[in-house]
């Protein structure tokens, strides 16, 4: 197995420019593909997850011209030209869920599949929602999970569509992005969410990006959404993908743990991503944080006790960035509790179980619950821990921070960061100092 040894490091400082947001990149690619007109996308993320989306769109007949982090997409005016396709989408939830919905109303025969872990990640709630409007979708192996077979169907929207919101916000995102493509009674489609909607900021990203492409979604709280139906997305001409706020969390934490000053460029107060809220969580733990419209600075810890304060917080809104808090909790002066993180169970791996296992390797006492994690830091971090990453990019990036505790750490399968941030470890090494 490949591995990477990091540290020991005692400080971290410098400036890092973030790669484009994964969540925004894949949404914008699909919206541009479905729109009328040509869209020039800049600062597009180059990663495993965006590559599978680009590959799928190409197979569906979308004209794409890529040059570095710029991609020119010629829209299909609401319908993919390819009426048969076999689409491999890796482990990219941001590709498989929205594409499944778009294909379900496209009148073709399609197969959607991915890596083995993708076939363990639920999609049944989305399929149930699509079946309510007439979609013909079959499960190939296990009920409720990919691979999927999608067949031509007569689509009609004549009643509110109900979808669960407590497993993944991507099911709602997929429906919202697809419903403008179909005709509905009274010219509008209504989606009603059953249960508490998790990861609300990601749905907000979807709605904001749809508006950039000319479609305005109205919402009543987070339970009822009204979407114009039978309308056409219109290209905004040019759109820039802002930096990835989830990826920012590792560098912001490094600036706190390693003293800084460390500046992250590409996200800030003007960001549309909820994960910029990570900076507020870090401030609650005592980090010295300042923020501009598109940058965030961290200069160590804002008191003289030398350790972060423990935190007890509901992380329902920022589940991805919360993983970084779990590792930062190793550097706190007491026990931290991360609540309302049940969605971790159905991500790239079971992140609650994985995080608990790996935190224990570096000496933490960890209590693992169905939707929470309690982390008590050790007196001293265990050196030379070999961290398993479970083919999960965020596990690898989070645990790089252990090296800032003055101990060496080994990251197994470091190339898994290719899912969202292929050169992460090069960027981290440029900032961390012995």
Swiss-Prot record:
Q: Where's it mainly located?
A: cytoplasm
Q: Where does 3-phosphoshikimate bind?
A: 22-23, 27, 168-170, 199, 320, 347
Q: Does the keyword Cytoplasm apply?
A: yes
Q: Where is the active site?
A: 320 (proton acceptor)
Question: For phosphoenolpyruvate, which residues are the binding ones?
Answer: 22, 93, 121, 170, 351, 394, 419
The coiled-coil segments of this chain are none
Recorded hits in Pfam families, A to Z, give: EPSP_synthase
Subcellular localization: Cytoplasm
**GO CC terms:** cytoplasm
- Give a short account of what the protein does: Catalyzes the transfer of the enolpyruvyl moiety of phosphoenolpyruvate (PEP) to the 5-hydroxyl of shikimate-3-phosphate (S3P) to produce enolpyruvyl shikimate-3-phosphate and inorganic phosphate.
Provide the protein name: 3-phosphoshikimate 1-carboxyvinyltransferase
What is the organism field in this record? Burkholderia orbicola (strain AU 1054)
Q: What gene is this protein a product of?
A: aroA
């Amino acid at each position: 197995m490949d591995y990477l040894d990091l540290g020991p490091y005692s400080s971290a400082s410098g400036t890092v420019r973030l790669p484009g947001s994964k969540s925004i990149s894949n949404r914008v690619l699909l919206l541009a593909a479905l729109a009328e007109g040509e869209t020039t996308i800049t600062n597009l993320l180059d990663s495993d997850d965006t590559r599978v989306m680009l590959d799928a769109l190409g197979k569906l007949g979308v004209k794409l011209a890529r040059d570095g982090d710029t991609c020119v997409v010629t829209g299909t005016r609401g319908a993919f030209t390819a009426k048969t396709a076999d689409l491999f989408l890796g482990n990219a939830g941001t590709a498989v869920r929205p594409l499944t919905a778009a294909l379900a109303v496209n009148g073709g025969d399609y197969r959607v599949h991915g890596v083995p872990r993708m076939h363990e990640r639920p999609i049944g709630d989305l399929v149930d929602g699509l079946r309510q409007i007439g979609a013909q979708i079959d499960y190939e192996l296990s009920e409720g999970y990919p691979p999927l077979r999608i067949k031509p169907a007569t689509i009609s929207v004549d009643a509110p569509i109900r979808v669960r919101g407590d497993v993944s916000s991507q099911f709602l995102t997929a429906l919202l992005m697809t419903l403008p493509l179909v005709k509905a009674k009274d010219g509008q489609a209504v989606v009603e969410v059953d249960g508490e909607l998790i990861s609300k900021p990601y749905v907000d990203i979807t709605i904001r990006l749809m508006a950039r492409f000319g479609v305005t979604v109205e919402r009543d709280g987070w339970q009822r959404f009204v979407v114009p139906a039978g309308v056409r997305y219109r290209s905004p001409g040019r759109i820039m993908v802002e930096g990835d706020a989830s990826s920012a969390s590792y560098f912001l934490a490094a600036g706190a743990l390693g003293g800084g000053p460390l500046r992250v460029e590409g996200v800030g107060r003007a960001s549309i991503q909820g994960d910029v809220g990570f900076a507020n969580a870090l401030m609650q733990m005592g980090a010295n944080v300042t923020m501009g419209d598109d940058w965030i600075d961290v200069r160590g810890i804002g008191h003289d006790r030398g350790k972060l304060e423990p935190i007890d917080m509901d992380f329902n809104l920022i589940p991805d960035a919360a993983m970084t808090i779990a590792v930062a909790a190793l550097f706190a002066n007491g026990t931290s509790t991360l609540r309302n993180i049940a969605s971790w169970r159905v991500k790239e791996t079971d992140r609650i179980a994985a995080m608990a296992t790996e935190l224990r390797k570096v000496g933490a006492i960890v209590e693992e619950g169905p939707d929470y994690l309690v982390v008590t830091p050790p007196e001293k971090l265990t050196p030379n821990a070999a961290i398993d990453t479970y083919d999960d990019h965020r596990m690898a990036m989070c645990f790089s921070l252990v090296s800032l505790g003055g101990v060496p750490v080994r990251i197994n399968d470091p190339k898994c960061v290719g899912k969202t941030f292929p050169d992460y470890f090069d960027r981290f090494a440029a900032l961390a100092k012995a």
